[in-house]
Amino acid sequence: NSTLYLVPLVLNELKDAPVMLKDLYDRIRPHLEDSTDFISVMDCLYALRAADLNENGEVFICLSR
């Protein structure tokens, strides 16, 4: 699975509320071939300013709805 395949999966997990980083990883893990795939998709979303991490360790969507 490519990083682009994972982007909508991650965004879907974040659509209702911020999610703790570890919990997000656990939810996405079944779709990963390697743990570095998670790092890649998170880097991509951060670079696109689509997701960020708050001071509580929660990942949240930055995109306007």
Residues covered by each model-derived region:
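Short amphipathic alpha-helical interaction segments
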Residues: L32-C44
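Minor-groove-contacting beta-hairpin "wing" of winged helix-turn-helix DNA-binding domains
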Residues: E58-L63
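A short, conserved structural fragment
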Residues: Y46-N56
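Short amphipathic alpha-helical segments
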Residues: P8, L21-K22, I39-M42
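Short acidic, hydrophobic short linear motifs in intrinsically disordered regions
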Residues: A17-I28
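Short alpha-helical segments that sit at the start of domains
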Residues: N1-E13, R65
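Amphipathic alpha-helical interaction elements
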Residues: R29-E33, A50
